[in-house]
Amino acid sequence: MHERTFHIMTFGCQMNVNDSDWLARALEARGFTQVPEHEAAIYIINTCSVRDKPEQKVYSLLGRIRRETKNRRNVTVCVGGCVAQQIGKGFFKRFSQVRLVFGTDGAASAPQAIERLVQEPHARISLLDFSEEFPERDAGWENGEVPVSAYVNIMQGCNNFCAYCIVPYTRGRQKSRSSAAVLDECRTLVGNGAREITLLGQNVNSYGLDPHGDGTTFARLLHDVAAIPGLERLRFMTPHPKDIAGEVIEAFGALKNLCPRVHLPLQSGSDRVLKAMGRKYDMARYMDIVTRLKAVRPDIQITSDLIVGFPGETEADFEQTLEAMRTVPFVQSFSFIYSDRPGTRAEMLPGKLSREEKTARLVRLQEVQNEYSEAALQAMVGKTVMVLFESPSPKSAAGSGTDAQNAAEESGRTASSWQGRDEHGFILNVHLPAPADLYGKIMPVTVTAARKHSLTGEPAGESC
């Protein structure tokens, strides 16, 4: 087994996924090779601690790696991300194979640290300090292929300190990236083939409002990125309802390439619970944002995050959340059972609900959401939409017995079934009359059927 082989396992949000993708490029630029898990000498686990469940999965994974590699020499485990920031050097005591822990700001220095681990077999390194400014790093796109749909970090950390949330403690205080650096990376991506960019941050609407900002507001940044020649689609995540400015709402009507889909976390439909959460908005404010968004872009689709079982949540509070879901409604929501996070205000609140009660409420909430998600997909049938293709369709979507996957495997990207998304973010699978390479192409597609989580369609014109 070659000592310069690695495998990355990622938990959590899109920012973690983006960090892992960057780390892979940076290591490959240093001569490391990414391989399947069982072939790797270096295991890198990028962790999430926003809820208890993904954190426990990390400990379970570390235990499995320890068992499965106990007879292998020179196995190195690196733990990064939010759990690493939270637990720190405690990983060294519990897991002998862990030789590097790096926090969210420390990720920028992880490639150099991993290089050192190869050269110094007994070294153990921790990178846990928060930087004063945004931890800028070489994007490394010259070392690999640019994705057709790319993600760009515009900030790090959060200043909101919602009662349930550990992010300000694990990702630090908000640090805005300079607009020049953001625009430079976006131009590089588009110049090398990206057709869609998603701007990432814990609270994108407060971009530029911290001491590290350069005077550029988020609305201004949206306009500047949208103006890059060749950029077909622009998205962003995640905004906070308390900070969304009128100029950002107006951008959905002014910018043709700003996609009509916004993720707007509600968390609860109860004003009483929202206040206890420290969200700093109420349902009236939230619905005003929704109304204004729909006024400037009538076809806009809204998704959300919802927490059930927050301490003290009553049945009446929960019913208000269900009513909010029916009023908006959300085309999709990510719903979670509340879990205590160490050091947060909510951890100390009275009125904790039983696991059984929280689970029952989650089931009810998801039943309501499934109804609206299915209705949104059914409403697309018969419409013609522009689809940006990102990959051959998986077998489950292309249909059993199709040659999509086989063709893709035999000839790279040539396949007769392709998967992509329309501007609203709906996933579409399209079967072609003959194998073709549609990666990065945009094609008009007529939707013919709705599945549980996606759509199927047929070509309605030529790709471009």
Swiss-Prot record:
One of its GO terms (cellular component) is cytosol. Residues 4-119 form the MTTase N-terminal domain. The keyword Signal does not apply. [4Fe-4S] cluster 1 binds at C13, C48, C82. Residues 393-420 are annotated as: Disordered. [4Fe-4S] cluster 2 binds at C158, C162, C165. Residues 144-375 form the Radical SAM core domain. It catalyses: N(6)-dimethylallyladenosine(37) in tRNA + (sulfur carrier)-SH + AH2 + 2 S-adenosyl-L-methionine = 2-methylsulfanyl-N(6)-dimethylallyladenosine(37) in tRNA + (sulfur carrier)-H + 5'-deoxyadenosine + L-methionine + A + S-adenosyl-L-homocysteine + 2 H(+). Binds 2 [4Fe-4S] clusters. One cluster is coordinated with 3 cysteines and an exchangeable S-adenosyl-L-methionine. Belongs to the methylthiotransferase family. MiaB subfamily. Monomer. This is tRNA-2-methylthio-N(6)-dimethylallyladenosine synthase. The gene is miaB.
